[in-house]
Structure formats: C-alpha cells, structure tokens
Amino acid sequence: MIIRLVRVMAALALLVFAAQPASATEVQQNPPNWGLDRIDQRTGLDQLYHYDTDAKDVTVYVIDSGVDAAHPDFGGRVKPGKDFLNGGTDTSDTNGHGTYLAGVAASKSYGVAKAAQIVPVRVIDAQGGGATDKIIAGIDWVTQNAHQPAVAVLGIGGTANDQLDAAVRALAAVVPVALPAGGEATDAGQFSPGRVTEALTVGSTDASDQVGSTSNYGEVVDLFAPGVDVPGPNAGGSGGRMLSGTSSAAAHVAGVAALYRALHPDVAAPDVTKALVDLAAVDVLTGVHQGTANRLLQTPGTQLRRG
C-alpha cells in the first residue's frame, strides 16, 4: 500500500521572508507571517507574534520527506535522524515537503517554536509517496527513541489502514502528534492516520478566519490552524515559498505543542494533546462544517493577551 503526502498547493512564486531576531521580550515583528500573528491572540491580527518560550529544549520529529539541514533558517538545529526509504541516516530532502513542515513548526523566521531541535525521519520519496510498512517503521522508531520532551508532525494521509492507525496511536501515547485532516473537502474520518482520535487532527484556515476550501472536516478534526498561503523554508536554498494545505496547519500545531512542552516538560503527551484543544479559541471561525468543532489553535499565554 502506498501512502502519499497530504498535498499542499504551491503559490506561483518563491519568496524570501527574512525575520529580524526576536527581542528580549520575545516578540517577532517585521511583521511576522499571518499564521504566527493569528495564533497568539483570540481575534484578529496585530502584526506581532508573541511567544513565551523558544522551546530550545524540545525536539520536533518530522516524519515526512526529510529536512534540508543546510537551510540557514534552521541554524544548525537539525539533528541526525533516520532514513526508512533506503536505510541509514541520509535524511536530505528531495521533495521539499518535510523541510517546509519543519520550518513552519520550528524555523527562526517562519516557525512557531523558534529554537526547537529538529529530527527528520524520512519515509516519503521525491515524488511524495511512501510504502505503509516503511512509514510505520519510521513512526515506531520515534515511539521507541524519542528524546523527551518531544512532539511529532506527520504530513501524510491515505485510505483507512488499521496498522498505520495503531502505530500513530502508540506514538501519541509518548509524544503529542499533529496530523493533517486532509484536503479532499470531505469527512476526515475516512482516512488514516487522520482518523486516530488520540492524535491532533488539524484542519486549515485562512487569514480571514475562514476554513480552507479544501480542508477535510468531521468529528475527528480536533482543531483548525493557519494553512492557507503560509510561508516556510524552501529546500535547496536560503529562501522560502508559500504553500497551502492541512499539512501547514498541522505544522503550526506541532510548533505550539513544542511551546507547551517547553513550559510544562513533565506533562504527559495525552495531557498536552488535551491542553491544546482546551486552549483553542472557540467559535471564531466561519465556514465550519456541521458536526465539526469550531476551534482555532492558540499559543500558551494567549489568554493573557486577549485580542
């Protein structure tokens, strides 16, 4: 069985998005991209991104197509990972999706958790496909070897598969896991691993708090996060690109989970998962499908900065 990336839609042009270093008060200005701006207050945009920690002691496991460790926005924080495509430790990114996810979660300019450590787990090939058994092996490796405190993000999805679901369920008992809801504009409960209730399944929104037009929905969607026209690092260079999709949204959630783990390193993974759902802004989104929770991702500390 072949699983594919939950595709993100690329804008026509690449972009360069250079951010100034965060000040001592931990506020990104310049301004930050809209996704970062949106998740640190309950309503609207204020052209700032506030964060209470840079999560330097948290590890983000990116189970995807690898990560471009040489991209300057990662600042040498990409640690040795594991390659389940060919065996060994080559986790370079020939697709670009994993680099982008890692950047939205944890890069200096584009990322939520700006100093988190990054470990690539390569399970997806250059064409965006991967064998289910190798994906499961990569997930199991993180379950068995995660350096705590840690979080994980997967950018994959496919037809229902009990074995894949079981692997993600076991991982979610060890680290908080962010999953894309998928981009078929249908019920996310039809797909694996997005239907795993122990993980955080994430739909996408735009800068106007509208649910993304292709975002999946349903009871298994735990919350929404920015996922339309979101910038992140481009593999094989020093700049960035703009992408859209629920993978982008899941990467935001992984970054916020890293912030939470940095502030509460001894809290168990399932409790972190619940905390992120509880922190979400409720009933601020439009276009939410009936039967889907109207929750928007928020960073820890947002309640002190009500917008």
Predicted regions: what is each one?
Residues 1-12:
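N-terminal export and membrane-targeting signals
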Residues 5, 36-37, 116, 120, ...:
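C-terminal subdomain of the subtilisin-like protease fold in secreted/lumenal serine endopeptidases
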Residues 7, 15-58, 72-73, 288-307:
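Protease zymogen maturation seam
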Residues 32, 48-80, 88-134, 146-151, ...:
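Subtilisin-like serine protease catalytic core
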Residues 41, 86, 123, 204, ...:
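Active-site donor-binding loop signature of nucleotide-sugar glycosyltransferases
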Residues 44, 65-66, 207, 228:
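Solvent-exposed coil/turn segments that connect beta secondary-structure elements
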Residues 129-135, 153-222, 229-254:
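Substrate-binding/specificity loop regions of serine endopeptidase catalytic domains
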Residues 241-242, 258, 274:
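Active-site-adjacent mobile loop/cap segments within catalytic or ligand-binding domains
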